[in-house]
Design a protein with these regions (language model features):
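Histidine-rich, glycine-flanked metal-binding segment
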Residues: 1-5, 11-55
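Activation segment
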Residues: 15, 35, 65-67, 85
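Short Asp/Glu-rich motifs
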Residues: 44, 64, 95-96
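Di-metal (Zn2+ and/or Mg2+/Mn2+) metal-binding site signature of metallo-dependent hydrolases
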Residues: 52-73
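Single conserved hydrophobic/aromatic residue that forms the stacking wall/gate
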Residues: 164-173
Length: 173
């Protein structure tokens, strides 16, 4: 008996094949069977008249800060996203010298219009280097996978000192 069986869903498998009505078995959090006659589940979900798809990958997000405090990375997880990529647009929070935190928050706020107050309240800054940032992310519980690029703005601020850099203004952006 499977842990979960999703019954009679319109399965879109992501390969370009035609949509097929099938059942999906899940055991220990992993898909173990897709098809018909896959057996019973301890929990069964009727997906009749509903699409069932693989998780989506969002290749351009700005969860760099939010990923350090929000295990759901909402709202993306509510929309079927199972993997996010951040470090986009050159803005992010690692590497980060302790005296550059406010500057990096202002950069993210200015370029991406993410409220600086939310970032300042949420980010714990328990890293300085990029590998330490990855370690901090790894320790966080989360409902989706993450991938991150090294943001060039943070690298530049770390290497040259953020005090020599000018933040973009609303007029420039």
């Amino acid at each position: 008996m499977h842990d979960i069986v999703i019954r009679s869903g319109k399965v879109v498998d992501g390969t370009g094949k035609a949509i097929q009505q099938m059942d999906i078995a899940i055991d220990n959090g992993l898909i173990t069977a897709v098809g018909n006659d896959i057996g019973e589940g301890r929990t069964e979900i009727d997906a009749s008249n509903h699409l069932v798809t693989p998780g989506f990958v969002d290749v351009h997000t700005h969860y760099d800060g939010q990923a350090t405090w929000d295990p759901e990375m909402s709202p993306s997880s509510y929309h079927g996203v199972t993997t996010t990529v951040f470090g986009n647009c050159g803005v992010g929070f690692a590497p980060a010298q302790p005296d550059s935190h406010d500057w990096l928050i202002q950069l993210m706020e200015g370029v991406e219009d993410i409220p600086g107050a939310a970032l300042a309240e949420g980010i714990e800054w328990n890293w300085e280097t990029f590998p330490e940032y990855l370690d901090a992310l790894e320790k966080m519980p989360r409902v989706m996978d993450i991938a991150t690029q090294v943001p060039h703005g943070s690298v530049r601020a770390y290497a040259v000192s953020y005090t020599h850099l000018t933040l973009p203004t609303k007029r420039i952006v």
